[in-house]
């Protein structure tokens, strides 16, 4: 059955306190009565930024000064397909008002999940909460060495970490030490699912699990729902369209896409390159971190192709 497809520009408007502006949809509209990020349809001949600038002036009486891409989402409702192109507006002039009679509200990012949004908006909430960089731990000598490296990474500004180790089961003392420190410093710590017992992912300071490709392809929605109901983030490693489609079906919180560039750890394996990465990222219905042969200086390029940011091991793991 043919479904109408509409292209929408939406804005996550951030004030100087780090709060996000949301607006309530009119009751008589599609997904009426729910909260949304301001914006509207992209008219023929408009760029996304043109549409966003026009819509925010019409809806909120503000002028966009600085805006950057945040995430692109394609979501299929029973009655239509919505293609959302979301930008983060970090500078604007004027005081926002509900210019069309709509309710508006400034909300702390961490409180966004307390509001009811259309289903297509869920990835936007995650994108706003996730940082630009995702550290995947490298080799370490012992617990003290691992903790020292994690502390150094956090001191440099890292806010999202995956503890990656081949030890099974993973030493509980190590996880507790890292979880305690991450909790104290407001850093999110993920554990590989294969290393993650119920005792571990219930620890204060453990924010979620990261699935390998094999775990992703073998996983079912009930497992993911169980994790997410307990407040856990669920991420996965992806390398191709098939794996991204599976991640979409499971409604994961974010994924990594690799390898973007050739890496020393996989000699002879070609990287996807930025053009292919951009095409694959467009398939994803959640934030995507680019991984493989990248450094922190690549975050701008990653953002330009629609990524949340960059992930890394060797370039991010302190010596």
Where are these regions (language model features)?
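Conserved, mostly hydrophobic/aromatic
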Residues: 135, 161, 201, 247, ...
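Alpha-helix-loop-beta-strand connector modules within alpha/beta enzyme cores
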Residues: 174-194, 213, 221-240, 269-295
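NUDIX/MutT-family hydrolases
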Residues: 86-88, 96-129
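Conserved N-terminal beta-strand and adjoining loop/helix that marks the start
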Residues: 1-20, 72
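Active-site mouth loops of central-metabolism enzymes
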Residues: 130-145, 234-236
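Glycine-rich phosphate-binding active-site loops on the catalytic face of alpha/beta enzymes
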Residues: 208-221, 254-268, 293-319
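Active-site-adjacent beta-strand/loop module that shapes the phosphate/pyrophosphate-binding cleft
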Residues: 73-95
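Conserved Nudix-box catalytic region and its N-terminal flanking loop in Nudix hydrolases
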Residues: 19-59, 70-71, 188-190
């Amino acid at each position: 059955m043919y479904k109408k497809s509409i292209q929408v520009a939406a804005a996550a408007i951030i004030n100087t306190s780090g709060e996000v502006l949301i607006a309530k949809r009119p009751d008589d509209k599609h997904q009426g009565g729910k909260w949304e990020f301001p914006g509207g349809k992209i008219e023929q001949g408009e760029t996304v930024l043109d549409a966003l600038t026009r819509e925010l002036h019409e809806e909120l009486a503000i002028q966009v000064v600085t805006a950057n891409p945040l995430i692109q989402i394609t979501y299929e409702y029973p009655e239509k397909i919505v293609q959302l192109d979301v930008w983060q507006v970090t500078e604007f002039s004027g005081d926002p008002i509900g210019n069309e009679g709509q309710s508006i509200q400034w909300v702390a990012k961490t409180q966004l999940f307390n509001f009811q949004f259309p289903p297509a908006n869920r990835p936007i909430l995650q994108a706003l909460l996730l940082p630009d960089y995702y550290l995947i731990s490298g080799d370490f000598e012992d617990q003290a060495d691992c903790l020292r490296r994690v502390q150094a990474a956090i001191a440099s500004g890292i806010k999202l970490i995956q503890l990656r180790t081949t030890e099974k089961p993973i030493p509980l003392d190590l996880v507790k030490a890292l979880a305690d420190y991450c909790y104290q410093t407001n850093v999110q710590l993920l554990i590989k699912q294969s290393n993650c017992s119920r005792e571990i992912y219930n620890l204060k300071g453990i924010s979620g699990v990261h699935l390998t490709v094999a775990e992703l392809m073998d996983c079912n929605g009930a497992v993911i729902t169980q994790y997410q109901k307990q407040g856990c983030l669920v991420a996965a490693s992806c390398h191709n369209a098939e794996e991204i489609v599976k991640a979409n079906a499971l409604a994961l919180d974010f994924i990594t896409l690799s390898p973007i560039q050739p890496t020393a750890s996989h000699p002879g394996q070609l990287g996807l390159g930025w053009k292919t990465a951009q095409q694959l990222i467009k398939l994803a219905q959640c934030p995507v971190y680019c991984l493989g042969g990248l450094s922190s200086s690549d975050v701008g390029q990653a953002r330009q192709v629609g990524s949340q940011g960059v992930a890394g091991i060797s370039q991010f793991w302190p010596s």
